[in-house]
Amino acid sequence: MGNIALTDVIPQDSLERQLYFIEKCKAYVADLQKKLGRPLTCCTQTFGCQMNARDSEKLLGILTDIGYVETEDEHADFVIYNTCTVRENANNKVYGRLGYLSNFKKKNPHMMIALCGCMMQEPTVVEKIRKSYRFVDLVFGTHNIYKFAELLCNRMESDSMIIDIWKDTDKIVEDLPIRRKFSFKSGVNIMFGCNNFCSYCIVPYVRGRERSREPKDIIREIEGLVADGVCEVMLLGQNVNSYGKNLEQPVTFAELLREVNKIEGLKRIRFMTSHPKDLSDDLILAMKECDKVCKHMHLPLQSGSSRILKIMNRHYDKEQYLTIVKKLREAIPDIALTTDIIVGFPGETEEDFQETLEVVKQVEYDSAFTFIYSKRTGTPAAAMEDQCDPAEVKRHFDLLLKEVQQISAKKAMALEGKVMEVLAEEQNTQDASLITGRLSNNSVVHFPGTPDMIGKLFMVKLTECKGFYYLGEIAENA
């Protein structure tokens, strides 16, 4: 970065170009800090999924490189909202926060506000921001996050709102600065976008088509993370099971997993999300063979009715899903299975719901995220007739939640008294004498410890099951 001189012609290489603008922004920030006699602060707020959380770490990396000091206070000199648009109420939440920020900006003329992420990919949203929230300084989407420094520089040199939204891209820019939330674990993007177009989901329209990173770049990033103290990585993609299909030399996710498993010093590998339609026998075998892969699979069901699954455009039926579960359990008997289930999808009947309930009873999920269907403007499902009666949907939701919780409690209780490996993750927020960690199966454990234990693995006896978490103690002679 030090080799990028501001007197040079702006580089055309994507990475060098952004490093150039980082240096330029750095000069502007240093000058303003000198005038104000204090450091400039920045605050990033993330709405939505782990992909967004990882993007926010990149945004924060650029901001801190430029010279901003991170704070959680929205009174900061620079506030950026990385938005989600999976549900329409997520949009309303952002509009509400912007109204809150407008008062801060009136008091601080140097304050800048930026909006990015999935919500900004909707033209109606951008138009509303342009007309009703003119105090916003910078608006960009999901495809050009790597250009953040350049866009910020443009705003620093201009008095008007900067808007830069791309419909799609095939570009992936490596090696930009990043500021991780945790020192010992990290998300790693292996791909971007989604090609699945489930009828209820807006993601493919705002995240674009699938594009995979080169395996060598992923391996190099993880090796660098491990050298920096990371012991657990989460491989991220909207559908990791379709990784590598669009590469010049195609690579499967199973092959990538085996390569990541070879990295010395890495202790744990997680991944999400897995679409059942692309879950191969070879991936199941790789999970069985790779000792660092955690014993946890998040496998969204969405519905147990083959009829509803077809309308959802999920590309599998109930029998195919149950076959995958059977194969997973045969290969990895102690694997924890979690899922997502939607209740009240348009046209869902009592019979359809009972099929979902039957699958839940048959699979016995360790836990499940259950949702009442939320109409999402811009998706095929939103225009479907035969929307369900809200009272009936609520009744079904309550029945499903009760069943899920009973099964989860039974599954959790089966581990009480066992000694298992736990990654210590943080000091307990309610009791400072306890450390909170996670099992390989993603269950939470609280046990006596000190902050210096964070980021390390311990054998812990699960002394008491509390339903959704365990109390434990360091095992003797472990």
State where each predicted segment sits:
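Conserved SAM/AdoMet-binding glycine-rich loop
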Residues: 110-115, 124, 227-350
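Terminal RNA-binding accessory module
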Residues: 2, 383-478
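Proteins enriched for Cys/Gly/acidic motifs involved in redox and nucleic-acid/cofactor modification
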Residues: 1-243, 282, 297, 319-330, ...
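Hydrophobic C-terminal alpha-helix "anchor/cap" residues
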Residues: 63, 129-130, 260, 287, ...
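Radical SAM enzyme [4Fe-4S]-AdoMet core and its adjacent flexible, acidic
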Residues: 49, 244-265, 312-315, 373-406
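Conserved, mostly hydrophobic/aromatic
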Residues: 198, 218, 235, 271, ...
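Contiguous mid-protein beta-loop-alpha structural module that forms a pocket-lining wall or clamp
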Residues: 348, 364-365
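Short flexible coil/turn linkers enriched for glycine and charged/polar residues
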Residues: 181-184, 194-196, 293, 303, ...
